[in-house]
């Protein structure tokens, strides 16, 4: 519980919205070796586009073992074989923080979006592989799944943005996961930017907001189609 309390205390709200107007919750998750402050510019950009959103940047719970910043799990000695164990060990706390902010704001999973960069994106993506989804949308910036994923719970939309020049997490992980998920019928967008490294720049911010604003989730289409069919005169 102390770790959860610390996460809640160290989170940065950007900005503090009018409580009567709040209709969405964005939760931002930074990469390894940096902190919640590093995602403030992302939150400020989102606040301009979504003025009725509650936007909070979460500080990872552990001091980074590489000398500065914070982390969800250590990347020292991380391999394809042990990455999943490290993510799984931190997932209960990650989910608890999301649920705590949902209770605090009165906003449910259907109006929650997770935006993660690097390790924060890994945790955000992997949250969709749990038994119950905690967010309707997940934005992965320079992230990856631990392994080939299954389709998230119905209603969850993924937006994956990656740089072809990323030296930290190869863009191939994004492409492979996206191709697999499309084949399985998942709702997602995936963009690989040819000149992008392991970073969040203005091009990424503009593309992210474009996807969030303009992509109509498949679940919305399904409901609209069902309503149209039910109202069609018989005979």
Model-based region annotation:
Residues 110-155:
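Primarily recognizes the serine-hydrolase "nucleophile elbow" in alpha/beta-hydrolase
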Residues 3-107:
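Serine-hydrolase catalytic machinery in alpha/beta-hydrolase-like enzymes
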Residues 23, 110, 153-158, 184:
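Short, proline-enriched alpha-helix->beta-strand connector loops that line the catalytic pocket
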Residues 160-162, 166:
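Short beta-strand/loop motif that positions the catalytic acidic residue
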Residues 59-63, 144, 196:
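Short beta-to-alpha linker loops that shape the active-site pocket of alpha/beta-hydrolase fold enzymes
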Residues 172-235:
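C-terminal catalytic histidine-bearing segment of alpha/beta-hydrolase fold enzymes
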Residues 30-32, 112-117, 163:
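Conserved alpha/beta-hydrolase "nucleophile elbow" surrounding the catalytic nucleophile
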């Amino acid at each position: 519980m102390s770790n959860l309390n610390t996460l809640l205390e160290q989170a940065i709200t950007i900005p503090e919205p009018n409580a009567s107007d709040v209709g969405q919750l964005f939760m931002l998750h930074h990469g390894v070796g940096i902190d919640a402050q590093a995602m403030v510019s992302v939150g400020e950009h989102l606040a301009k586009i979504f003025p009725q959103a509650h936007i909070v940047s979460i500080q990872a719970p552990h001091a980074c073992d590489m000398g500065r910043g914070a982390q969800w799990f250590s990347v020292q000695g991380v391999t394809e074989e042990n990455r999943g164990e490290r993510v799984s060990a931190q997932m209960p706390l990650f989910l608890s923080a999301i649920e705590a902010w949902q209770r605090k704001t009165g906003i449910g999973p259907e109006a929650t979006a997770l935006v993660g960069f690097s390790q924060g994106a890994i945790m955000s993506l992997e949250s969709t592989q749990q038994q119950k989804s905690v967010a309707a949308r997940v934005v992965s910036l320079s992230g990856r799944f631990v392994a080939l994923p299954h389709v998230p719970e119905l209603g969850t939309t993924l937006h994956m943005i990656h740089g072809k020049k990323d030296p930290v997490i190869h863009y191939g992980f994004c492409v492979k996961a996206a191709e697999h998920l499309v084949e399985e019928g998942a709702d997602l967008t995936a963009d690989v930017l040819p000149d992008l490294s392991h970073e969040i720049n203005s091009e990424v911010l503009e593309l992210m907001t474009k996807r969030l604003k303009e992509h109509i989730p498949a679940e919305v289409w399904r409901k609209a189609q069902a309503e149209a069919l039910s109202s069609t005169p018989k005979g």
